């Protein structure tokens, strides 16, 4: 892709959270562009309460792998296609997911729901076994002593070889070192599946991905406004 001819990807604001158009991780020295961002919340007593803003960052190599199948499709077509989001999840490029808190949450409180969703998906997909149960235990342990005040973040790095790197920050800064790396491909993919897959916790994030990625696939990638 020739950047000079590409489309301009801009940052995204989710409530008071800013998601830059691109980031570079000091832990890996890799750069990622913002595929999309959106809110996650729950309806409590008839009122929608926003708890988290989620941003999905992709390596630029993801664009070509997605474009071979999805270039030329409309945003609505992509939003309506589960296969599109599954292709993002399984694309042969590294992903970095940032989950930043809008309300205070304990690590145990936050991770419990994430783990429930991941285990439910893996069981339904037939990928949950002894290794995955052990990986879930490591996941729980990583969050046990963590608290999330408003504005704090968890970063999930999903490597192409199935590793899931976790890091924690009191703001939106990517830590220089990861807190833990869990070697389990099924769990790694399940984290993103629960966010943008069949039973997505953030329809807003899915909509944003379906709106932004067609522009990149059709016009190339040019990052602005970091």
From Swiss-Prot:
Show the Pfam families listed in the entry.
Chalcone
Signal peptide annotation: none
* Catalytic activity reported: a chalcone = a flavanone
Q: Name the InterPro entries on file.
A: CFI (IPR044164), Chalcone_isomerase (IPR016087), Chalcone_isomerase_3-sand (IPR016088), Chalcone_isomerase_bundle_sf (IPR016089), Chalcone_isomerase_sf (IPR036298)
The answer to keyword Isomerase applying to this record is yes
State which Enzyme Commission number(s) the record gives: 5.5.1.6
Q: Which UniProt keywords apply?
A: Flavonoid biosynthesis, Isomerase
UniProt record, GO biological process = flavonoid biosynthetic process
Name its pathway: Secondary metabolite biosynthesis; flavonoid biosynthesis
An example Gene Ontology molecular-function term: chalcone isomerase activity
Q: What class of enzyme is it?
A: isomerase
Q: Where does substrate bind?
A: 52, 117, 194
Superkingdom of this entry's organism? Eukaryota
Swiss-Prot/TrEMBL site (Important for catalytic activity) positions: 110
Q: Which PANTHER family match?
A: CHALCONE--FLAVANONE ISOMERASE 1A (PTHR28039:SF10), CHALCONE--FLAVONONE ISOMERASE 1-RELATED (PTHR28039)
Q: What does this protein do?
A: Catalyzes the intramolecular cyclization of bicyclic chalcones into tricyclic (S)-flavanones. Responsible for the isomerization of 4,2',4',6'-tetrahydroxychalcone (also termed chalcone) into naringenin.
Q: Which family does it belong to?
A: Belongs to the chalcone isomerase family.
Miscellaneous comment in the UniProt entry for this protein: Part of the biosynthetic pathway for all classes of flavonoids, a large class of secondary plant metabolites, many of which are brightly colored.
Name of the molecule in the record:
Chalcone--flavanone isomerase 1
Q: Which organism is this entry from?
A: Lotus japonicus (Lotus corniculatus var. japonicus)
| Name of the gene this protein is made from | CHI1
């Amino acid at each position: 892709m020739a950047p000079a001819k590409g489309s301009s990807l801009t940052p995204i604001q989710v409530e008071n959270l800013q998601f830059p158009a691109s980031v570079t991780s000091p832990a890996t020295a890799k750069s990622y562009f913002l595929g999309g961002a959106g809110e996650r919340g729950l309806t409590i007593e008839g009122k929608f309460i926003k708890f988290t803003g989620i941003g999905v960052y992709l390596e630029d190599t993801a664009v070509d792998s997605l474009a071979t199948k999805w270039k030329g499709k409309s945003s609505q077509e992509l939003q309506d296609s589960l296969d599109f989001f599954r292709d993002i999840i399984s694309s042969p490029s590294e992903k970095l997911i940032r989950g930043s808190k809008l309300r205070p949450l304990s690590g145990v409180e936050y991770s419990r729901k994430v783990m429930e969703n991941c285990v439910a998906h893996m069981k339904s997909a037939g990928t949950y076994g002894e290794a995955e149960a052990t990986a879930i235990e490591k996941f729980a342990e990583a969050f046990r002593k963590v608290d999330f005040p408003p504005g704090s973040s968890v970063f999930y790095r999903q490597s192409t070889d199935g590793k899931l790197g976790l890091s924690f920050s009191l703001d939106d800064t990517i830590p220089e070192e990861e807190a833990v790396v869990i070697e389990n491909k099924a769990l790694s993919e399940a984290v993103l599946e629960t966010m943008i897959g069949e039973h997505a916790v953030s329809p807003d994030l899915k909509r944003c991905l379906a709106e932004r990625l067609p522009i990149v696939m059709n016009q190339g990638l040019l990052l602005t406004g970091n």
